[in-house]
């Protein structure tokens, strides 16, 4: 499992010209599931995601987390994130979880995040062609692994 997070002023995801998820200030998280991701890894990633300090404190240092700020969280599944890009000129997706396994894992990850982040968690639509828009704040971008 890997999650690419971006600190945003706002973000939204549309499917067929319909907004299916949107947030104000917070984090956009692109989520790539890998074969064999476990419940423990999902829980660890949720803890890291909600506790990762990427927001400024009073002194301007990145010392506050999403949990501290109460910001929004937009989770978007993205199997291409788990691609093997080590060789050649075309990505291989053998390192990404198969669709059914990935959907189960992503949905469980969303549940865990919702249980632990009362201010709200929005999502895209698994497996759909999505148009993601965001206003990057910083930019501040990190790749997290459990």
Curated annotation (Swiss-Prot):
The keyword Secreted does not apply. It is an enzyme of class 3 (hydrolase). Keywords: Cytoplasm, Hydrolase, RNA-binding, tRNA-binding. Homodimer. A Gly-cisPro motif from one monomer fits into the active site of the other monomer to allow specific chiral rejection of L-amino acids. The gene is dtd. Its EC number is 3.1.1.96. This is D-aminoacyl-tRNA deacylase. Pfam families: Tyr_Deacylase. Gene3D superfamilies: D-tyrosyl-tRNA(Tyr) deacylase. SUPFAM superfamilies: DTD-like. GO terms for molecular function: D-tyrosyl-tRNA(Tyr) deacylase activity; Gly-tRNA(Ala) deacylase activity; Ser(Gly)-tRNA(Ala) hydrolase activity; tRNA binding. One of its GO terms (biological process) is D-amino acid catabolic process. InterPro entries: Daa-tRNA_deacyls_DTD, DTD-like_sf. It comes from Stenotrophomonas maltophilia (strain K279a). Disulfide bonds: none annotated. Belongs to the DTD family. An aminoacyl-tRNA editing enzyme that deacylates mischarged D-aminoacyl-tRNAs. Also deacylates mischarged glycyl-tRNA(Ala), protecting cells against glycine mischarging by AlaRS. Acts via tRNA-based rather than protein-based catalysis; rejects L-amino acids rather than detecting D-amino acids in the active site. By recycling D-aminoacyl-tRNA to D-amino acids and free tRNA molecules, this enzyme counteracts the toxicity associated with the formation of D-aminoacyl-tRNA entities in vivo and helps enforce protein L-homochirality.
């Amino acid at each position: 499992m890997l999650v690419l997070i971006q600190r945003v002023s706002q973000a939204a995801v549309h499917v067929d010209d319909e907004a299916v998820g949107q947030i104000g200030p917070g984090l956009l998280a692109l989520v790539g599931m890998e074969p064999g991701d476990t419940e423990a890894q999902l829980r660890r990633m949720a803890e890291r995601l909600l506790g990762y300090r990427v927001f400024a404190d009073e002194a301007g240092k990145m010392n506050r987390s999403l949990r501290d700020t109460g910001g929004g969280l937009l989770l978007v599944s993205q199997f291409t994130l788990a691609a093997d890009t080590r060789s050649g000129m075309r990505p291989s997706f053998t390192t990404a979880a198969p669709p059914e396994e990935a959907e189960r894992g992503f949905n469980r990850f969303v549940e865990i995040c919702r249980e632990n982040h009362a201010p709200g968690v929005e999502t895209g639509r698994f497996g759909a062609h999505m148009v993601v828009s965001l206003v990057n704040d910083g930019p501040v971008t990190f790749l997290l692994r459990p």
